[in-house]
Design a protein with these regions (language model features):
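Secretory targeting signals
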Residues: 1-7
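N-terminal export signals
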Residues: 11-31
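Aromatic- and carboxylate-lined catalytic core of secreted/periplasmic carbohydrate-active enzymes
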Residues: 52, 384-387, 396-538, 553-564
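Active-site-adjacent substrate/metal-binding segments within catalytic domains
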Residues: 74-89, 129-246
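Extended acidic/polar, glycine-enriched regions
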Residues: 78-138
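The substrate-binding groove and active-site-proximal loops of carbohydrate-active enzymes
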Residues: 159-169, 211-224, 249-259, 282-302, ...
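Active-site neighborhood of glycoside hydrolase catalytic domains
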Residues: 258-376
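Catalytic-core region of carbohydrate-active enzymes that cleave or remodel glycosidic bonds
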Residues: 340-425
Length: 565
């Protein structure tokens, strides 16, 4: 009879898409010479402790030292997998022969200490961009993202704060969502690891099939939670979607303490660091718990505690994955940590009512781009589609174009109903203080038109040299009033080579481009941002003042693309 643990292992092998190596002989050399794994895929090895431990998670530390083909060495954390089993995972973009030796804080444990083996990393031959080009990094100019091999990466994220919870069932519902997002053009998914912003502390509605990730009574990890989570997270990667890992919401730090928060991060690093992941320190770093009796004191305490954890995360970040932090309402990650230089890129949160959120988001974006140290800036939480029964697709496409044409290397979308994966069976749209932001379910929300239309925008930009573009607000007429400034038009490009301009429905009937170079001709076309349709314009040159204009024949928003000939 097949045992439940065997079912999970079989499914893990079926769905994860990893190169796994296993041995049933404790204390032997677990890896035989000649094992192979494709570049950027995960090599995993399992070991059994030969010594008894009352509390394996807290009583023993397990690591592995990897020797690269050029002889350099790097140590990586291993992890407790439950019972007496410990594992390590590893991946590399480099090709060649690697060797490893395991290290235990208990040197007398022959099952965990000084186990040796070799394996070979071979070229990946598939078409998954994350495996072909490698994990995501900050570009040399500190303004956009690239893959490890330098290929530009135009970020389009989606927000699944409760995406690992069992109310988004594995495999059918999770795979439905993943397929939908990949087809629409998304390439990153941000999610919490069970300790989500919805519900009370350690709320059981955020469990997966195996419970919560953290056993508060025992002060340790629940490895079985991560067994179920692995299926989902590896499937994201297999589908070309970057896992943006947010282990916990900010207010948990006062409940768990910094020591346990560091241990949680080290465990996440050990299990998912070999994936092309992005690390987000925590969600809404300084936001107090909803019903806290001491909110004024909690925020500064949370910033101090998470700043300590950030320094630790930077220290143990053995794969060099990008690190950011998700800020509370109305600010950026720079303001949520004591040393912003430890962040690789900035995230901003500007609120959820479009007419207020867009101007605030643009202000935060410009402030961060002008601050030191330089780093890319993402609108990471802004005016979720459908939240408060507002912010529909017209708002979403304007947020996208406002973001990318104002200097951001992408955009993170969100839809109310999806962020918490509320359903009729598992309603989760009411916060602990009693506030509801809307009634819709994820089964409806994933079909909101805004998710399609931001994907249309990303696909259109991906055909251009978007990573060379800089904001150029001087290329369009200024708004007639300060109130309209954030809502009319945005322009970016490369002088003399490329211009991309968004004209909203509030722009004038006469669409005008300024500052055209006298010696340059452009081939121009409009994009209808709601459906991607192209409307040819033809050859464009400025007049003696460098001005060109055309009377619009469509009152809806339009994107003008001008490519030098």
């Amino acid at each position: 009879m097949t045992q439940p643990s065997e079912i999970k292992r079989r499914d893990f092998l079926k769905y994860a898409g990893m190169a796994l190596a296993a041995s049933s002989l404790a204390g032997a050399a677990f890896a035989a010479s000649g094992e192979r794994v494709e570049q950027n895929k995960v090599f995993e090895k399992s070991f059994r402790a030969s010594a008894p431990y009352r509390d394996p998670f807290n009583d023993v530390e397990f690591k592995v030292r990897i020797t690269f083909p050029d002889g350099r060495e790097q140590t990586y954390p291993g992890y407790w997998a439950g019972g007496d089993v410990f594992k390590f995972r590893f991946s590399s973009h480099e090709l060649g022969e690697f060797s490893y030796v395991t290290l235990s804080s208990n040197p007398s444990d022959a099952g965990l200490h000084q186990q040796r083996g070799t394996f070979r990393v071979v070229r990946y031959e598939g078409d998954n961009a994350l495996l072909k080009h490698g994990p995501i990094r900050v570009s040399a100019d500190k303004r956009h993202f690239t893959h490890l091999d330098g290929t530009p990466f135009l970020w389009l994220g989606d927000t699944w704060w409760c995406g690992l919870a069992k109310r988004l069932r594995w495999p059918d519902e999770f795979k439905l969502m993943t397929k939908d997002r990949a087809e629409k053009g998304f390439n990153a998914i941000q999610f919490t690891v069970g300790l989500a912003p919805t519900g009370t502390y350690f709320d059981r509605k955020n469990e997966n099939e195996n419970g919560l990730p953290w056993d508060e009574a025992a002060q340790r990890i629940n490895p079985a939670y991560f067994d179920a989570a692995d299926l989902r997270v590896f499937h994201l990667v297999d589908s070309g979607l970057v896992p943006v890992v947010v282990p916990t919401w900010g207010f948990y730090i006062l409940r768990m303490g910094t020591v346990n928060a560091k241990k949680l991060w080290q465990y996440v690093m050990a299990r998912w660091g070999a994936l092309p992941a992005v690390w987000c320190l925590a969600g809404e770093i300084s936001m107090p718990y909803y019903t806290s009796a001491t909110p004024a004191e909690d925020g500064p305490r949370q910033i101090a505690a998470w700043s300590e954890v950030l320094a630790h995360l930077r220290e143990i970040n053995c794969y060099g994955h990008m690190i950011s932090a998700h800020p509370k309402f109305g600010t950026s990650a720079r303001a949520e940590v004591e040393n912003p230089a430890l962040l690789d890129f900035d995230m901003i949160q500007s609120g959820h009512i479009f007419m207020q959120a867009l101007p605030r988001a643009l202000t935060l974006l410009r402030q961060s781009r002008s601050a030191a140290p330089a780093m890319p800036v993402l609108m990471d939480e802004v005016a979720y589609e459908g939240i408060a029964e507002t912010n529909w697709e017209d708002a979403q496409r304007q947020l996208f174009w406002a973001s990318v044409l104002s200097g951001s290397p992408g955009f993170t979308y969100g839809a109310h109903g999806i962020t918490q994966f509320s359903s009729d069976e598992f309603p989760s749209n009411v916060q602990p203080q009693g506030l509801s932001w809307g009634e819709d379910t994820w089964q409806n929300a994933y079909q909101y038109r805004g998710s399609t239309q931001v994907g249309i925008g990303r696909k259109a930009l991906a055909e251009l040299e978007w990573w060379r573009m800089e904001p150029h607000p001087e290329w369009v007429l200024p708004a007639k009033s300060e109130n309209m400034k954030a809502f009319t038009s945005y322009a970016a490009g490369v002088p003399g080579r490329l211009r991309v301009i968004y004209f909203s429905a509030l722009s004038a009937m006469e669409l005008t481009v300024l500052g055209l170079e006298p010696e340059v001709s452009y081939e121009a076309y409009f994009i209808v941002p709601s459906n991607g349709k192209r409307l040819p314009v033809g050859t464009v040159r400025g007049n003696r003042e460098g001005v060109w204009s055309v009377t619009r024949t469509r009152k809806h928003d339009l994107v003008l693309v001008m490519v030098a000939t």
